[in-house]
């Protein structure tokens, strides 16, 4: 099976990466973080 070059498509996405962070800046070490 030959390797084929993947097609790169740029898509519009309304979500930003900062949505997945904490809602406020008050961070606690005892809380489970996403990363």
Curated annotation (Swiss-Prot):
Gene Ontology biological process terms from the UniProt entry: pyrroloquinoline quinone biosynthetic process
Biological or metabolic pathway of the protein: Cofactor biosynthesis; pyrroloquinoline quinone biosynthesis
Species annotation: Roseobacter denitrificans (strain ATCC 33942 / OCh 114)
Protein name per Swiss-Prot or TrEMBL: Coenzyme PQQ synthesis protein A
InterPro entries the UniProt entry points to: PQQ_synth_PqqA (IPR011725)
Keywords in alphabetical order: PQQ biosynthesis
Protein role: Required for coenzyme pyrroloquinoline quinone (PQQ) biosynthesis. PQQ is probably formed by cross-linking a specific glutamate to a specific tyrosine residue and excising these residues from the peptide.
Domain of life: Bacteria
UniProt xrefs under NCBIfam families: PQQ_syn_pqqA
N-terminal signal peptide: none
Family of this protein: Belongs to the PqqA family.
A Pfam family reported for this protein in Swiss-Prot or TrEMBL: PqqA
Cross-link (Pyrroloquinoline quinone (Glu-Tyr)): 16-20
HAMAP family for this protein: PQQ_syn_PqqA
Gene: pqqA
């Amino acid at each position: 099976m030959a390797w084929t070059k993947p097609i790169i498509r740029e898509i519009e996405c309304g979500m930003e990466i900062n949505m997945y962070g904490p809602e406020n800046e008050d961070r606690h070490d005892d809380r489970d973080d996403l990363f």
